């Protein structure tokens, strides 16, 4: 069944000690059924998430419980991984019931064809960021990390979390990346007439650029920056803020 209104959220970075507490996001998840009938999480829901084969890190139990409850109530949930949480797998897909993509995806949202990507790796300005993007996606890197004890792996990830941001914490870098994303999105829409939407995240900069023919580029901005999200219907895209 095609959804009539998709709730879009990105860049909550749950687990980052400096970010907004998870309870605010849990209140948002409770409100999602009143906002729309499908949830799309476009990357960096967590400041770090890595799925082990037989161990589930306890840090985000409450969030997964909320997501599982939404699925139990029939809410479709899609999660496109970001540079902090692209390493999901069977736990998300089978146990929680989420449609998980480790990279970009093409989806039908509210009857509109959409290219969805978190945005890292698309417009990186520095060679080091491009290299990091390739290394963290490589199967050998993922396999090696999986051999570490989870306590050690999560400790190491916490220490390296800043590097996963690709230098994206600098305001000027984010502004430049946001401009590059808009150019990328408009170019993609121009090249591919079958696409109605391009949906990105990563820069923490909200953006909505509407084009003729009911087509648009949208970045909802960062949830951690003022509880930002967006709504997508068959005819509109709207940037919003949640009141927790």
Describe each PLM feature range.
Residues 2-5, 14-109:
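Core catalytic region of metal-dependent phosphoesterases/phosphodiesterases
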Residues 16, 49, 87-88, 123, ...:
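Hydrophobic positions within alpha-helical membrane elements
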Residues 10-13, 44-45, 83-84, 119-120, ...:
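Active-site metal-binding loops of divalent metal-dependent hydrolases
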Residues 4-11, 44-46, 155-168:
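Short, basic/glycine-rich phosphate-binding loops at helix/coil junctions
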